[in-house]
């Protein structure tokens, strides 16, 4: 950042206007960047972008490195042809435009994102494969963690079966085979998040707007980071 004084606005991505339950990387985000520029501002401060866990707080995340799938723009997926306007409009995201109904958001948005994944034919997408390779150092553990968490009905990893809780190699191999498509779905959501976020960030920077990010102070106990790297933490 510049040594000169700067002025900006703190606005969580989730607070941007949206008819699909939560603010995201849609046209509203670009409109906000334009509004900042017109107002003579030079900074946009946001809250952490990680996938939220229990309590839906951005400061308690399932991963230090992953992005929140809720922020993926459904409008962009409609433009890509992997979702339809009718499908998105048919989902109940809640009736209060001033607040986020996370229960309905989780149910509805994940269903739509899964449809987009199934229609995307990511296996033939070279950009997706390159993303998998370049981000494998965190992505493989995160995607497996989220897939196994779903298999165990959302329970924290400390309550999973012993073999996968302790990451025995035979268990890791088994779940990677058994949950292949769910793992790929998790990776697809991270791919779309990264793609859309970098596009928005590049646009903001081109308009002279810098992004001030934020991260949680601590790594969450129930996270892919802790599960995959237990030797880095003091665990009971």
Roles of regions detected by a PLM:
Residues 2-230:
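Acidic/aromatic-lined carbohydrate-recognition and catalytic surfaces
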Residues 232-236:
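Catalytic cores of eukaryotic secretory-pathway lumenal/extracellular enzymes that build
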């Amino acid at each position: 950042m510049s040594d000169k004084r700067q002025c900006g606005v703190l606005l969580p991505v989730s607070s941007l206007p949206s008819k699909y339950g939560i603010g995201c990387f849609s046209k509203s985000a670009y409109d906000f960047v334009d509004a900042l520029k017109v107002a003579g501002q030079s900074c946009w401060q946001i809250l952490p972008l990680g996938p939220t866990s229990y309590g839906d707080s951005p400061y308690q995340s399932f991963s230090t490195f992953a992005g929140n799938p809720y922020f993926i723009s459904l409008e962009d997926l409609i433009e890509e042809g992997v979702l339809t306007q009718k499908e998105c409009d048919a989902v109940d995201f809640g009736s209060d435009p001033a607040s986020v109904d996370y229960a309905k958001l989780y149910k509805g948005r994940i269903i739509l994102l899964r449809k987009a994944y199934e229609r995307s034919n990511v296996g033939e997408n070279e950009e997706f494969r390159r993303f998998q390779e370049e981000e494998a150092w965190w992505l493989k553990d995160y995607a497996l963690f989220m897939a196994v968490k779903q298999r165990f009905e959302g329970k924290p990893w400390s309550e999973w079966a012993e073999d996968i809780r302790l990451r025995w190699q035979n268990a890791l191999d088994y779940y990677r085979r058994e949950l292949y498509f769910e793992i790929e779905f998790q990776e697809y959501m991270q791919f779309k998040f990264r793609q859309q976020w970098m596009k928005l960030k590049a646009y903001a920077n081109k308009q002279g707007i810098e992004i001030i990010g934020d991260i949680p102070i601590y790594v969450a106990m129930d996270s892919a980071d802790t599960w995959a790297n237990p030797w880095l933490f003091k665990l009971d």
